[in-house]
Amino acid sequence: MSELIKLDAATLADKISSKEVSSAEVTQAFLDQIAATDGDYHAFLHVGAEQALAAAQTVDRAVAAGEHLPSPLAGVPLALKDVFTTTDMPTTCGSKVLEGWTSPYDATVTAKLRSAGIPILGKTNMDEFAMGSSTENSAYGPTRNPWDTERVPGGSGGGSAAALAAFQAPLAIGTDTGGSIRQPAALTATVGVKPTYGTVSRYGLVACASSLDQGGPCARTVLDTALLHQVIAGHDPLDSTSVEAPVPDVVAAARTGAGGDLTGVRIGVVKQLRSGEGYQAGVLASFNAAVDQLTALGAEVTEVDCPHFDYSLPAYYLILPSEVSSNLAKFDGMRYGLRAGDDGTHSAEEVMALTRAAGFGPEVKRRIMIGAYALSAGYYDAYYNQAQKVRTLIARDLDAAYQKVDVLVSPATPTTAFRLGEKVDDPLSMYLFDLCTLPLNLAGHCGMSVPSGLSADDNLPVGLQIMAPALADDRLYRVGAAYEAARGPLPTAL
């Protein structure tokens, strides 16, 4: 294993810009690690070695010529979740229905990464169309957690998190619909951030649930995550839900936080997310120790009541399937991707039905059916409409909380990583794993998972979730970096 792959992204960027090492050398080191280890983890669906090295060489030429580099992360390679379109690699979303499909255009996030001089190593594995909490729903096989290959890395973005934990990439991009960045980060001892909804473009992000989906940065340190956040955030006229607002200076916040002083910062512990049935003792012990550490850094910690959080799970699992049933209607075999039964003996309607039956996995079909039912004429008011009202109440709970505190904290997940296959046949148990993360998606607010150590129960990673109001993403980074610095180095998976 090359020593280069153990370095954080900020250090690699400094070494590249100072000519101590070339971007091509760094990129090749990570490609070698992928080749050597991905048979064990299956973090990647596609590896773009040729394209990544070409991008790295472009940065190296700029460094050699003394040119201004396009971003602070120029030359540092990255793993991209396979839900963002790319013109030079397939985009499958972990689904058979898009097997082999290559987009004619880049997602805005992809384009920003290219413009920043960041080589894209490849596309990472995920639950099909981002529906799942374990990356077991991928049509191309599950991703395994580098901490224990008999356990899941979380989902839906388990591939990106596993790639970071296995030193296959120093940076990654994920998406977060109900916790799909934060939850895998917690299970792999990496850092993941769900930015404020609308602050990272969704153009070219294949939609799961349009009012919930949000792309975001992942890395092994808070500062690296902030540097990547700054690259991908910003208004995009191609995205109708994009927010026209300045991007908070998350990098400055991370650097300030690393000083370790949280004097005057008001932190609320969410009453509904700190205990209860289903919480693992080791997770709660790690969380309580993290809260004590935040207090020791000077923060004012109080308990905050968010009563409607108790209804977030049923509301989420009505709203999300409803949007899924609409968004996935376009995958019908008529335009692109898989086409089944096209032998001249079936009508167009039959081809559509056969294509969807063959192309979608069980979880996707389940959510389409739930969504179609919730949106049907007789049940729209009873289910979907009621869920949207609960969503408003959850947002009001958070707004009220932020009148009293600057950030909220909770465990990122109720337990550590569960075993492969443990929850596959129990959808409700799988859905409950999102309990801590999904309220923020319903409200459109921002959140971070930062490693808080290993559980005493099983020696597996635990994540501390930090939450902040919309457009206050910088608060996450200040508190997260302060906690990270005080916590000190952690063991790694490898």
Swiss-Prot record:
Its EC number is 6.3.5.7. Keywords: ATP-binding, Ligase, Nucleotide-binding, Protein biosynthesis. InterPro entries: Amidase, Amidase_CS, Amidase_dom, AS_sf, GatA. It comes from the Bacteria. It catalyses: L-glutamyl-tRNA(Gln) + L-glutamine + ATP + H2O = L-glutaminyl-tRNA(Gln) + L-glutamate + ADP + phosphate + H(+). One of its GO terms (cellular component) is glutamyl-tRNA(Gln) amidotransferase complex. SUPFAM superfamilies: Amidase signature (AS) enzymes. Disulfide bonds: none annotated. The active site is at residues 81, 156, 180. One of its GO terms (biological process) is translation. One of its GO terms (molecular function) is glutaminyl-tRNA synthase (glutamine-hydrolyzing) activity. Pfam families: Amidase. Allows the formation of correctly charged Gln-tRNA(Gln) through the transamidation of misacylated Glu-tRNA(Gln) in organisms which lack glutaminyl-tRNA synthetase. The reaction takes place in the presence of glutamine and ATP through an activated gamma-phospho-Glu-tRNA(Gln). Heterotrimer of A, B and C subunits. Belongs to the amidase family. GatA subfamily. This is Glutamyl-tRNA(Gln) amidotransferase subunit A. It comes from Mycolicibacterium gilvum (strain PYR-GCK) (Mycobacterium gilvum (strain PYR-GCK)).
